[in-house]
Amino acid sequence: MAEPSSSAPVGRPRTNLWLESRYRKLRRGLPQTVFFCPRCKGDRRRARDCTECGGYGKLTKESVQELIARRLLPAMQAKGGRFHGAGREDIDVLMLGRGRPFVFEVVGARNPAVDLEALRAEIVARAEGAIELAPFVPVPRARVAYWKETHFDKIYRAEVALEGVPTEAALAAARAFAGNVVQRTPQRVAHRRADLDRERSLQVLGLRALPDGALEARLRCQHGTYVKEWISGDDGRTSPSLASLLGVPARCRLLDVEEILTDDAVAPADPVDAAARPVTEG
């Protein structure tokens, strides 16, 4: 594949630019942005003796941000970059469908006039199946605020492990659920989020049995819904939950974002065929 040109006069003035795209995340264990160590915060001096990250400064080798930046910034001879996503998925969650919108802010680019399509193709090729990208589109800075401040419903696919066998009546009630749920700040994020009750809307689009006795659930959720906690109930902090509707303990063993319902998006009509999905486990 031809390398995108990055040659530019050394004395050329630097400029900032904003590139909008969407990413599909096809490998689990990949965070959206740099996953700095919570103990040393990535500080080189503190990282030397850090037992949390072993001196690495980060808890993962790569992120969506880094996979893009490692090729984009050198090609544009930029001083740095910032990743602005329209929300984020958990590190163990895939981002499928048309992908998650984002704006990559390129800071101090000396060579902004690169072939964006060649650059995108090079980034995807070097990511080796971890991500896919929509074409880059130069946009005004205001698009950062738009994606940060505008909230959209999402379609999820979840695999749910059960401890027990729900009744047919309970399954019917769960399949028919569409309404509001109240979620107290989940235990897993309570150390960094205010302890509040949040009300969110959720609709079950489908619920079917899998061969191993688990369930596959397809959900439409309001922005900010803690889907894993809605499935388990989070020790009573989410009500109603799928576990309470089914009458048996439940936990989310796998979660994918199938679509973000931006104004021009259409929700998938049918469940995604897991066997046909290009997914790399990590």
Predicted feature residues:
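Non-catalytic RNA-recognition surface used by pseudouridine synthases
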Residues: 1-282
